[in-house]
Every structure is written in structure tokens, then in C-alpha cells.
Amino acid sequence: MRSAFLIPLLLTASMASSTASAEDFPADRVVAAAAGDWDKDGTPDLALVVRPTDESDVDNGLYIYLHKTNEARLELAASLPNTLWGSMMMSGQEPELVAMANGSLQVITKNETIGRERWRQTLTVAYRNFDFIVAGYTFSGYDTVEMDENGENRTKSCDLNVLTGKGKADDKPVTAKAAFVLLTDWDDAIGQKACGYSR
């Protein structure tokens, strides 16, 4: 959704309270934000990626807020600290959030600059039955050392509908068990296994 919504949403999020496990954090630790209508009630909601403190070695946190209808505030609906890999110190490793027109949220992690394996992963998160689930999993990557039979970097590419268990990996159909996986229960190994990869 339009970035003009982000400033007031960030301000109201800083005052949000919920039964979810809330964590207080200053605005300068917010490294990615997206506004969209996650629950499709016609009001803008918010998602944030928050980096850990400088003294911590844990991963980034993901926090998703829902707008309280008829109230001028956001409520924390999902709190996932130590969830998203990524670094703001190195270009090409920053986590990203993208609000989709259909109300879904894309959560992107990547390593596009360092090491032998370069990759990009996208979780498509949807709001269903009053909770957030992982509806889709997309992964692409390449090996900077290993070559294929054509002398090009060996690549991987997978697009999976988690809800149906159907997708494609390296241009071949793949079928996994259809699953309704809550975002809080998601492990990247679920998608990697379905695609026939390991990382």
C-alpha cells in the first residue's frame, strides 16, 4: 500500500498493545515496513521487520499489526522475534516486506552478495481464520562455483503453493502434502523439503 500510510501507522504501532508477545523497540531499529489490508476490513494494517539490538546475535523480528475497526490504533496480531535472517551491514542481505494488492504479505530474505550460494526466498503470508498462515513459498538461487552441463552456474528455482502442496521446482512439477501452516509454526525446511532442496 502507499507509503504515505506508513508514518501514521508507525506512530500508532509504537503505542499498540495486545495479548500477543509485544516487544518495545525504538523506531531506528525498524528496517522494513509494509502497509496493506491483511484482514480485508477496508482499513490499512502494518508489518515491520525489526533488527535486534547491537549487542545481540539473534535474527531480525517480524511484527504484524491489525487496525482496530472504529479505533485510531493498531493492535499487535503476530509477534515473531528472532525469525528473519538478514543483515543491514551488507548490501544484498536485507530482509524485505511487500504488500500485495490481494491483501497478502510477502516476506523476503536473501543472500545475493556473499559466499558460494546466492539465494532469494519469499514467503507469501495470508490472513485466514483469524490467524496468519504461509500460503506460498518461492525460492531461487545459484551456485557461484558449481557449473551445469552448459558451463553456467547451477541454479535452483521453486514456486510452491503450500495450501495445495503443488508447484514447480526447476521447471518440473512437484507435489507435497497440502498444509495449513501457521506463520508461527513455519520452518524454511518445510519449503526446502517440498522443493527437493536442502540449505
PLM region spans:
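Beta-propeller blade termini
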Residues: 29-40, 90-104
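Blade-edge motifs of beta-propeller repeat domains
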Residues: 20-28, 70-92, 178-182
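Acidic, small-residue rich beta-repeat scaffolds with periodic aromatic anchors
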Residues: 102-199
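Short, surface-exposed coil-to-beta transition loops
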Residues: 45, 59-61, 92-93, 117-122
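Acidic/hydrophobic-patterned starts of short beta strands in beta-sheet-rich repeat architectures
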Residues: 40-51, 98-110
